[in-house]
């Protein structure tokens, strides 16, 4: 579970395809604090740490993740919003979110409302809150 509050900006260092899976190697300020099998939200998508090497770590996205998210658009050098999972007893500064992405949307309008912004999105598909979980 995550709060939805971005903790750091990571950099995609390497992208490797293996059959239908894609391995992403990233660097960020908290890499040395990560552990294998830990969940990290990447642009809101929950991915599991599978390898750590110095100041870089690797996560793997399966075919369904690649289809339902924008991870397929990532390039080496891309900046990625990161958040480590919540801990029991920690502060909840945002909202409880899963990090399980079911679809992507297109931003069709951005409106300046004098100090805040209104975003309007369109998406296709069923009106399903959580398809799988």
Residue ranges with predicted function:
Residues 1-133:
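Conserved loop->alpha-helix
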């Amino acid at each position: 579970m995550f709060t939805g509050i971005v903790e750091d900006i990571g950099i995609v260092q390497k992208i490797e395809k293996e059959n239908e899976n894609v391995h992403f190697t990233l660097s960020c300020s908290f890499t040395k604090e990560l552990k294998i099998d830990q969940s990290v939200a990447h642009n809101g998508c929950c991915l599991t740490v599978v390898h750590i090497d110095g100041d870089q770590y690797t996560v793997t996205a399966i075919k369904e993740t690649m289809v339902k998210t924008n991870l397929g658009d990532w390039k080496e050098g891309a900046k990625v919003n990161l958040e480590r999972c919540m801990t029991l007893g920690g502060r909840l500064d945002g909202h409880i979110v899963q990090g399980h992405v079911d679809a992507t949307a297109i931003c069709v309008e951005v409106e300046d409302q004098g100090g805040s912004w209104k975003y309007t999105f369109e998406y296709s598909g069923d009106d399903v809150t959580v398809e799988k979980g």
